[in-house]
């Protein structure tokens, strides 16, 4: 299996307790929208029983020159190390894996259901399909507790506003604990939505 070295360009908070890590895409690294890959820390300052490798969905689409990985920041050695890594830090990435992708028949709509951080493969799939003008009608349902927890909510709303083929339906299940005004859907994803 081929492994590549990748360099951290920047890290940013994209929702409450959620960070995105942007890496320069290595030469020759090719993937399909919706795939994932193993990221391995190189000589981390600490480790735990879970080890130094994690599998992440690739949140960026293939047409971009960067690889973006998004995660909820939990208290593990891996995430503490990643969360404090400086620009220029190097990690290893394995070959892309998985066959989670948009079907090829544009006559059939693509309907995607995501919860929380599970939005990451759909970020790649939807942005690639919109850029390619795939012709698919796309319906992306995304459930979160609160808008504060919804990674890339604003970006997906903007993409949907620009592309008539994409309908983005975010819904919030815990607005009683939110400090933000929300006028969209509430409750779990249902057939009626």
What do the PLM-derived regions correspond to, one by one?
Residues 74-193:
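FNR/FR-type flavoprotein reductase catalytic core
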Residues 2-89, 144-146, 171-174:
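Ferredoxin-reductase
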């Amino acid at each position: 299996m081929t492994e590549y070295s990748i360099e951290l360009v920047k890290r940013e908070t994209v929702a409450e307790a959620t960070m995105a890590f942007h890496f320069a895409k290595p030469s020759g690294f090719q993937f399909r929208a919706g795939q994932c890959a193993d990221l391995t820390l190189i000589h981390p300052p600490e480790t735990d029983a879970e080890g130094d490798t994690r599998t992440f969905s690739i949140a960026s689409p293939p047409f971009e020159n960067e690889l973006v990985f998004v995660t909820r920041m939990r208290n593990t050695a891996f995430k503490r190390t990643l969360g404090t890594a400086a620009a220029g830090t190097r990690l290893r990435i394995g070959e892309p894996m998985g066959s989670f992708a948009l079907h090829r028949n544009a006559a059939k709509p693509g309907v995607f259901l995501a919860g929380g951080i599970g939005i990451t493969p759909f970020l790649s799939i939807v942005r690639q399909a919109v850029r390619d003008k795939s012709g698919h009608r796309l319906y992306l349902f995304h459930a979160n507790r609160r808008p504060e927890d919804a990674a890339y909510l604003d970006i997906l709303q903007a993409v949907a506003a620009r592309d008539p083929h994409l309908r983005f339906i975010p819904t919030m299940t815990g607005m009683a604990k939110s400090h933000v005004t929300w006028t969209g859907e509430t409750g779990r994803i249902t057939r009626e939505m």
